Amino acid sequence: MKLIVFGATGGTGRQVVVQALEEGHEVTVVVRKPEAFDLRHDKLEVVKGDVLLPATFRQTMSGKDAALSALGVSHRNPTTVYSAGTANVMEAMRAAGVRRLICLSSAGLDFPSEMPLLQRLVIRLVI
């Protein structure tokens, strides 16, 4: 399959890319800083882009079989990348005719010390 991956510079996203390449898939990663993405492979294409700026990756979506999102967020601005970024990815998918989207996250596995205790407890119970 021809895959496009968002969030490839994080731990979860990088593992997604590694496993996809091991399975023989062609993988395109969209990253803000391509020079910081050190993984290399014959079936890997690294493209500069930002999920908050859809024009930077819209063309790259063409011809892909599926999109995978392992987007992570900072605790200072926790929803913008997930909500606006994923909406931008989905819009680019619609325009390119890509019908499969897989979203995964490590959210809930690590809690910042500044998160209120009650919030941490509720999340632990749910997850």
Region annotations inferred by a language model:
Residues 108-113:
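Conserved catalytic-site region of short-chain dehydrogenase/reductase
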Residues 42-66:
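Conserved Rossmann-fold cofactor-binding substructure of NAD(P)-dependent oxidoreductases
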Residues 3-25:
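N-terminal Rossmann NAD(P)H-binding glycine-rich loop of SDR-like oxidoreductase domains
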Residues 6, 30, 68-71, 101-106:
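SDR active-site strand-loop-helix element
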Residues 30-35, 50-51:
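N-terminal Rossmann-fold cofactor-binding loop
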